[in-house]
Structure formats: C-alpha cells, structure tokens
Amino acid sequence: MFLNIVTADGAAEERVIREMKARAAGARGDIEQIVRGVMADVQARGWEAVVEYAEKFDGKAPYIVEPKVLDDAYNACDPKLIAALEKAAANIRDYHEQMLVKTWEWNRSGGETLGQTVRGLSRVGIYVPGGTAAYPSSVLMNAIPAKVAGVGELIMVTPPTENMSNEVLAAAKIAGVDTVIAIGGTQAIAALTYGAGFIPQVDKIVGPGNAFVAAAKKLAFGTVDIDMIAGPSEVLVIADHTANPIYVAADLLSQAEHDKLASAVLLTDSMAQAQAISCEMERQAKLLPRWDIIKESVANYGCAIVFDDLKDACRMADVVAPEHLEVVTAAPRELLPYLHNAGAIFLGQYAPEPLGDYMAGPCHVLPTSGTARFFSPLSTDTFLKKTSVIEYTRDALESYAQDIIALAQSEHLDAHANSIAVRFAEENDNENR
C-alpha cells in the first residue's frame, strides 16, 4: 500500500505521535552557534556588520525597494493572479475585522472605573523568503491582519534575488506594506531586532524562513516579540465511509508535497476506506511534479490509522494537536465538540485545506508540531498590545483600603501598605484628636 495502514491499538497511535513530534527537533547546534555569532556582531557593530553579512550572503548591500518597483511588479503580473490576490485580500481583511478586539471600559460600582486600551503595535517586521519559497499568499496572510490591527508601520524584508518575485512584490502592494527592504537571512532578523542604518528596530517579527531564520527569530525573542517558530507542515484528516476517496487523497497530497518532513495522516473507522484512499493517493501522486518529495514524506511521515470509533480518532487528534485538521464525515459538526487542539479545523467535503491556505480568510500561519495545544493562529491579536486602565475615587479606594493593607503586610511589603495608608492618614489623625 502507498499509505501505511495500521489498526489502532494504543501502540500504533503513540508511534505516529512520536514520529510527528520528532520532525520538529530544534535547529542543529552548529546553526544556532553561527546565528548567535551573527546576532551578537550586529548588536555590537550595527550597520557595518549588517552590510558585511548582506554582501557575503545576499551578494549585495541592503536597499529599499522603491514604490515604483512594486507598481511595475503589480502591472507585470497576470491579471487573473492579481484578481485572485485582491479577492483573497478582501476575504482576509473581512475575517480579521470581525475578530478585532477594541478598547473597552466598565464601571463596576460607584467610583470604580476599569478598562483596557487596545492598540496596534508601532512597528512590525515581516520576513518573506526568496527563491522557490516566495509565496505571495504568505505576504497577504501576515500583512493584512497587522494592518487591520492598526500597526503603525509595516516593514517587509526579503532576499535581493536576481529577479525578485513580481508576485510577492504585488502582494506587498495589495496588502499595504509600508516599506520593502531587500535583505535576507539572519542579518535581516538581526537588523530588525536591534535596528541598524536605515532599518529601524521593530516591536515584533513575523513570517516563515529557513533553519537560520527560525534560529534567529528564537534568539531575537525577548528583545522583540515573534509570532512562532514554525515546524514542518502537517494535516490530519478524520474521514468516515461517506468521504470521497478522491477528495481525501488530494487533500493529504496537498500537504505531503510541501517538503520531505511534511506529514499527512488519515484517521478513519473503515479499513475499506483507508485502502481506497491509499490507492487513490498513489494514482494522483504519480501525476504530480513533486512526486519525489511526496513519495518520501508519505513513506516517512504518512499513514492511516483505523479506529473502531471516530471519537477515539478525535482523542488522538487532540493529542497530536495538528496544524490542519479536516473532518470529512456525514455529520462533521457532530464531532466538533470533541476537537479542542488544532491550528485550523476544516469541516465537510467542500472545505479542503487549500481553501484555508489561500482564500477563506482565516490566517494560514498556524501552530505546528503539537503547539496548537497552547498557541493560536496568527491574527489581529498577534499585533495588538493591551493595557489595563484603573481609575478609582477616594471613597472607592477607601472601601478596600484595609483589605489592601492586610494583603501587603502579609507579604511584608510595608511600602505597599503605606501607599494606601498615607491617603487616609489625615482623616485618621482627625478622628483620634
């Protein structure tokens, strides 16, 4: 069988989970050591170091891509692609406007006013890979939620390849990126982290990249914020006997083609369905240009597990906490209450994972490698800073004064207690006279 098929027995599920997590092993020590050196050098020497590394690894010094270049790139693209990008951008914008959290205020009781101000970050950097990994959809998915959130300035960095992708530059124009800078690799992340030359320090860095970029983002965290450290792509598909094997096979292959570490796993309650989907995957895969990648990723990280009950499949899905989770059953919404951990859940035969990658509106930047247990997809929330606001009248504070003093004294923080007591000391003195 093209797809390894096993019957759920406890051990089979654990093996699959273990193998999927093993794909997400951190960057090799030698990569982290190199990246640490570059980051430290840029922090110490600034622009001089950035230019040296850019000339060494990018082949030229960093430069700002002029707006006219973006306009020309937009005009050079196929009109059908521009129409698709514009439509996707509108859907992404609409979705994120629905979820945008706003400033709020609450009067709990007389004299107690509480609230929260919600503001977009001042400046955000987006890393966009070059070469074959330059995806215009990723530009839209990273930039538009930031713009909806109200980010003040959006800076995109991308390697200065011989022919910068017209599609990527057009997407930057459509998304409203403020500045595009031609610089890639660790040196780009370092410049955004510490600020150097005409590249200002940002508040947050988002976007995918290779192992060096991922290691640099990890080291940058704390000086600036980051979105997440993305691992290899993955999909789990829960399918019953009613699912169309052609559809499910195509969806599994759409993840398997990403790279040799991608994982495509089928969970079903039908051995016949598992076998049919496996055969269909092999038929379709042999017709695809990325056959060599698919063959290896499916052999290493693809499988089908047959359960007696799909609720057991849901329990496994929750442990795996996959990046993408498709539910292709007769009544997919009936399983939704049992599914808690996934980057995105796709319900039914007509919500395939590529719909989310390109067009539906929710961001396709999702937690991988089991981190959907505690991480959420990139969204407007990623680019917001929330600040608590507290306002009390004298009477309101006085009603809690002795409680606050008691709590502060129990922690031996006498200055805290005194901060409350001094506000009512004169009144107490008058009462004692």
Locations of the language-model features?
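Short internal beta-strands
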Residues: 152-160, 264-270, 277
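Conserved small-residue-rich beta-alpha loop and adjacent elements
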Residues: 106-170
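C-terminal core of ALDH-fold dehydrogenases
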Residues: 318-433
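A glycine- and small/hydrophobic-rich beta-loop-beta segment
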Residues: 258, 266-342
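Alpha-helix C-terminal capping segments
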Residues: 141-152, 173-175, 193-199, 217-219, ...
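Conserved NAD(P)+-binding/catalytic subdomain of aldehyde/semialdehyde dehydrogenases
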Residues: 176-254, 258-263
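N-terminal Rossmann-like NAD(P)+-binding subdomain of aldehyde/semialdehyde dehydrogenases
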Residues: 1-122
